[in-house]
């Protein structure tokens, strides 16, 4: 297994001039318009995305499985100029495991630590520029409070 392990946590907040929509567009390599400020965040040409998926707790509207709907709902729900919008996690994954094994590993982690506690989680697994499985890592964004 890995000799070193990276795990970082940060807050995405307007007080730090950050946007949940911009962060979601970046990690998912998508183009998403932020309905809060009208800005379009376009990362569809970004390379390295291996997998993305949204996890919903029970009793959450299925419409929030759509990334644009989810993060725009968060942006529009929070009114304060310094609002905390999402938690952001970056986790190194074991390069010794296959992509499918890493997906299973991170899915279990997300279910146990976030979804079971009522949070929505947005996962993106990235591959660095290395050949093979080097620098494989997960980006996870979670909601700060329940949405319904």
Where are these regions (language model features)?
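N-terminal nicking endonuclease/strand-transfer module with a His-rich metal-binding environment
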Residues: 1-148
């Amino acid at each position: 297994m890995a000799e070193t392990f990276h795990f970082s946590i940060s807050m995405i907040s307007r007080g730090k001039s950050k946007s949940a929509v911009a962060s979601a567009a970046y990690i998912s390599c998508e183009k998403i318009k932020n309905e809060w400020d009208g800005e379009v965040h376009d990362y569809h040409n970004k390379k390295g995305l291996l997998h993305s998926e949204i996890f919903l707790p029970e009793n959450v509207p299925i419409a929030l499985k759509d990334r644009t709907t989810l993060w725009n709902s968060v942006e529009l729900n929070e009114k304060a100029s310094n609002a905390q919008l999402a938690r952001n996690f970056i986790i190194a994954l074991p390069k010794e495991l296959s992509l499918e094994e890493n997906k299973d590993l991170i899915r279990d982690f997300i279910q146990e630590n976030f979804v079971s506690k009522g949070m929505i989680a947005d996962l993106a697994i990235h591959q660095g520029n290395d050949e093979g499985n080097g620098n494989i890592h997960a980006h996870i964004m979670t909601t700060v409070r329940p949405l319904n």
